[in-house]
Swiss-Prot record:
GO BP: any one term: positive regulation of macroautophagy
Protein location: Secreted
Signal peptide (from-to): 1-23
PANTHER family assigned to the protein according to its UniProt record, in alphabetical order: INTERLEUKIN-4
Disulphide bond pairs: 24-133, 48-88
GO terms under cellular component: extracellular space
InterPro entries per the UniProt record, alphabetical: 4_helix_cytokine-like_core, IL-4, IL-4/IL-13, IL-4/IL-13_CS
Function: Participates in at least several B-cell activation processes as well as of other cell types. It is a costimulator of DNA-synthesis. It induces the expression of class II MHC molecules on resting B-cells. It enhances both secretion and cell surface expression of IgE and IgG1. It also regulates the expression of the low affinity Fc receptor for IgE (CD23) on both lymphocytes and monocytes. Positively regulates IL31RA expression in macrophages. Stimulates autophagy in dendritic cells by interfering with mTORC1 signaling and through the induction of RUFY4.
A Pfam family per the record: IL4
Entry protein name: Interleukin-4
Highest taxon, organism lineage: Eukaryota
Alphabetical UniProt keywords: B-cell activation, Cytokine, Disulfide bond, Glycoprotein, Growth factor, Secreted, Signal
Protein family membership: Belongs to the IL-4/IL-13 family.
Record organism: Equus caballus
Amino acid sequence: MGLTYQLLPALVCLLACTSFIQGCKYDITLQEIIKTLNLTDGKGKNSCMELTVADAFGPKNTDGKEICRAAKVLQQYKRHDRSLIKECLSGLDRNLKGMANGTCCTVNEAKKSTLKDFLERLKTIMKEKYSKCS
C-alpha cells in the first residue's frame, strides 16, 4: 500500500514544521523579553532604575522557579511604581508569567538589588536561555 504522490509533500512539510517547532518552546517569548529588556536599558537614567527590589535570582539561574520569582518581583514593582517604565514592565511581566507556566513560588525579600541590576541579570539569563535554543 503506497502513498499517493499528492499526500507525500504534505507529510514531508508536516514533519519538517513539527521538528522546527519542537526546537525551543519559548523561542519567540525569549526574543520578546530580550527586546523589552534592551529597551529598558535606554531608560537607565530614570531615577526609578535605582529603586531596590527583591533579588530573585540564585547562583545558577536555571530553574523555572527563578523565572517565576522574577515575574513576582516585577509584579510587586508594578503595583508601587507609576512611571513610564511601567508599560515596558507589564509586557515583560506577562511573558515571564507565561514561561513560568503557572508555577507557584515565593520571593525572599531579604536580599535586595537595584531594579537596573535586576533587569541586567534577567537579560543575561534570557540571552543564555535563547542561545541554548538556537
